Amino acid sequence: MRPCFTFTAKAGDKPAVLALDEEIGFWGTQAKDFRASLDGITSNELVVEINSVGGEVMAGLGMYNMLRQWANDGKTITTRVTGVAASIASVIALAGDKRQMPKNTFAMVHAVSGGAWGTAEDLREAADVVDKIQVSLRNIYVDRMGIDEAKATEIMAKDTWLTAEECLTMGFATELTDAVTATAKFDLARAELPEHVARVFKAEDAPADPVAETEPEPEPVVKPSDQANEEEQV
């Protein structure tokens, strides 16, 4: 099963790079590998490149907490959005003390969602759990972005898409960088991105193949005998 991240260790003092470029899920098979990747970093710097539409909230929250724990040991994390950081991926992006966003990238914040099956009591308990997770994520937005609870509640009330400039203004990003050409490893169709966001991932139309020049077909050669026959038929 392919993990939702790739890890590249760098020699010497160069930052290690962790690329999160898939939907976040199947956490039970990846938690140990993610932790092992962090524990194996010899550099004091880590760059986390993010291009994800989100996924399982507890998986992403686990990633965020591991990254913050790693940074709290006196190390430096830079998060860099390379396309989109949506849903729980937006929380992971906030794990960096330096948070870079190219000018044509986006973040999306919204409320926690989940499903449940069972009795009415089971459904009420599930709703209570969702509410508690919602508060936990709201507190992260408040703490890392420097906004108040009312603003965090407002942007989480619906799918709130933020441009890189808006992210800088609101404290989600700390630095804007030059625009990039983004590619998506996740399923763009299933992600249901707004058109202005999906355009980031659309490559320019490839130039059309040059029209091959065709030589005119040669005139049919009429043999004298054929010409005589034609005259007889007229």
Where is each model-derived feature located?
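N-terminal organellar transit peptides
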Residues: 1-88, 95-234
